[in-house]
């Protein structure tokens, strides 16, 4: 889809209106969890596309018209950030933050890591922050770029940054994107990442409730991003612990099945095992 030369939303006189426009979009994205996923990216390619599409419907009427006209672009390009990971080495840290890396001696890492970027850099250095992920700060940066695109009346920029914003917000809602044990590799639970964010939604998303109300204005988008990370991180122990408990109840031949996905037989967690895990989490994946 080409947007060059397309007429963008009317440029209001005050910058604050443009900022509120972006903040409302961010509010909608934070409101919307995921719906379904494939084995790609934080929520899978399909999941990220669905998040962006459904977030559009939470926007107020003055915003909805513009984004509805471009909803296919916003949805299709929701996965661009994941595709860039293969070409841009700076991209990967934008999708996560291993906040538990900063927890020493039982201290609360959220009390140790400053929420403001400049203060965090002063305390830990930028190299350290980049090494362990920067997703909450990158959400703020993308929102700023989106706001500037509105100021310029740059339709291409608006759509580009709005698509990216949805992606990073979605990533911040994944518990395993907030821990060094992101794939269970430290607890002998290899593969739990894709299990949680892909297999469960794949089998259950049709039953999820997608009616989430309207987006609300965010006074402090950086705090909202950090709150999403915090809410994700407090669920890490449950994500890992409940899977260990379910695993102990299932023999290997009931835990996995082989399915033909056009590339020969591929091993997946069984429907029975997946349901047992999802039931134990009491709908966590849908809520996130």
Q: Residue ranges of each PLM-predicted region?
A:
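Generic N-terminal simple sequence motifs
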Residues: 5-8, 29, 171
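N-terminal, motif-rich segments that launch catalysis or mediate targeting to/interaction with membranes
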Residues: 31-164, 175-288
């Amino acid at each position: 889809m080409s947007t060059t030369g397309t007429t963008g939303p009317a440029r209001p006189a005050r910058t604050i209106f443009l900022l509120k426009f972006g903040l409302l979009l961010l509010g909608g994205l934070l409101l919307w969890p995921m719906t379904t996923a494939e084995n790609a990216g934080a929520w899978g390619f399909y999941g990220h596309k669905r998040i962006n599409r459904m977030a559009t419907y939470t926007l107020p009427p003055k915003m909805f018209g513009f984004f509805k006209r471009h909803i296919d672009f916003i949805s299709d390009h929701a996965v661009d950030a994941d595709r860039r990971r293969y070409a841009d080495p700076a991209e990967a840290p934008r999708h996560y933050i291993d906040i538990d890396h900063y927890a020493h001696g039982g201290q609360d890492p959220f009390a140790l890591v400053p929420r403001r970027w400049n203060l965090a850099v002063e305390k830990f250095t930028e190299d350290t922050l980049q090494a362990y992920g920067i997703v909450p700060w990158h959400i703020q940066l993308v929102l700023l770029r989106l706001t500037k695109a509105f100021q310029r009346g740059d339709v291409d920029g608006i759509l580009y940054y709005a698509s990216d914003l949805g992606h990073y917000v979605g990533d911040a809602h994944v518990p395993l994107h907030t821990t060094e044990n992101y794939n269970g590799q430290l607890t002998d639970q290899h593969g739990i990442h894709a299990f949680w964010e892909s297999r469960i939604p794949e089998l259950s998303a049709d039953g999820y409730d997608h009616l989430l109300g309207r987006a609300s204005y965010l006074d402090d988008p950086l705090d909202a991003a950090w709150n999403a990370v915090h809410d994700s991180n407090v669920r890490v122990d449950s994500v890992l612990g409940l899977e260990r408990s379910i695993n102990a109840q299932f023999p290997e031949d009931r835990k996995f099945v082989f399915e033909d996905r056009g590339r020969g037989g591929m091993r997946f967690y069984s429907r029975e095992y997946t349901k047992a895990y999802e039931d134990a989490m009491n709908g966590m994946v849908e809520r996130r």
